[in-house]
Amino acid sequence: MVDGLSFNLGYSELETSSAEDGASDNNDQHEGTFNLNYAIGAVSIGAQKSVVNASGTSETKYDSEYFGISYAVSDNLSVSYNNIESNKNVDGTDVDQDFDSISLSYTVGGMTIGVLDAEADNASYSAGRTQSARSVQMTVAF
């Protein structure tokens, strides 16, 4: 194995059924994912792929790719960028969602201050819907 390299693989299966008023509805879900992460010095890079197939009253498939990179500027300051591209297919109709974020984190003693700027195109898999968010947070450890 290469120093700083990690790889994960996962699969899950959820089988559910419910009968209400004599009707039967199967809502099975199958999910597979894998990721690859590499850290060298002050830089960490990660990528992930996941696929979710769900059945029920309609066939739904989510196909997502994740990418992130972070850089530790110093022991106290780090910056990171993340991107998620996801496709939702319901009974043959596709919608692509794209999410980008950049964050900055500064730690001193037991206190961390973080700043995040994020934007999603086709947010919540709604074509033409754009959402953006900015946040500042402070965490204190005692």
Show which residues each predicted segment covers.
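Outer-membrane beta-barrel proteins
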Residues: 1-142
